[in-house]
């Protein structure tokens, strides 16, 4: 949905998200991708502040779950989804990615509303319900072995993409 949130400004800065990822109780991870060798690395938090400047200039993503439980402005985003029964809402996960950052092609077993906060991200989905769902066995993440996109969009701040459970998707930070 283009411009689903007109004039959207991310309620949390990358610096604040990184700070949250340093908290002992926060559920945080960094995913790094070596595109040349197609190697993936998963690092779990909590992180030390000095670990962020040591990350590469591109090809990584920071993800923090349950951000709505830490930040009232992030929690306020849930008001836009009051039409969904509360038992179907888990949390607000926030990601920050440098150019080329991705978590790989994967499938979630729950409704996902992707709201683009800062920068632009390319999203591809495979809308075929019979698409292969086998996972790679060479990585710690549950990444799809095969992914053939049927749709492709670049989301900008305020844009939203809805993904029903079981829809394969792949997002890569453009900037």
Regions found by a protein language model. Give the residues of each.
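Short amphipathic alpha-helical segment that frequently serves as the phosphate-/nucleotide-binding helix
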Residues: 14
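Conserved beta-strand-loop-short alpha-helix elements that form
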Residues: 162
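Active-site region of the double-stranded beta-helix
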Residues: 7-10, 18-159, 167-175
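Short hydrophobic motif
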Residues: 1-2
């Amino acid at each position: 949905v283009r411009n689903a949130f007109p004039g959207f400004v991310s309620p949390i800065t990358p610096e604040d998200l990184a700070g949250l990822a340093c908290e002992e109780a926060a559920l945080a991870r960094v995913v790094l991708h070596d595109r040349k060798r197609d190697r993936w690395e998963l690092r779990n938090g909590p992180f030390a502040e000095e670990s962020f400047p040591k990350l590469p200039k591109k090809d990584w993503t920071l993800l923090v779950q349950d951000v709505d439980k830490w930040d009232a402005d992030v929690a306020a985003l849930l008001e836009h989804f009051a039409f969904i029964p509360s038992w179907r809402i888990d949390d607000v996960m926030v990601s920050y990615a440098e150019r080329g950052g991705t978590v790989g092609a994967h499938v979630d077993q729950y409704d996902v509303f992707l709201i683009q906060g800062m920068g632009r991200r390319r999203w591809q989905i495979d809308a075929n319900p019979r698409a292969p769902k086998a996972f790679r066995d060479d990585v710690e993440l549950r990444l799809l072995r095969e992914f053939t996109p049927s749709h492709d969009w670049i989301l900008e701040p305020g844009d939203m993409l809805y993904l029903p459970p079981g829809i394969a998707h792949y997002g890569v930070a453009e900037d």
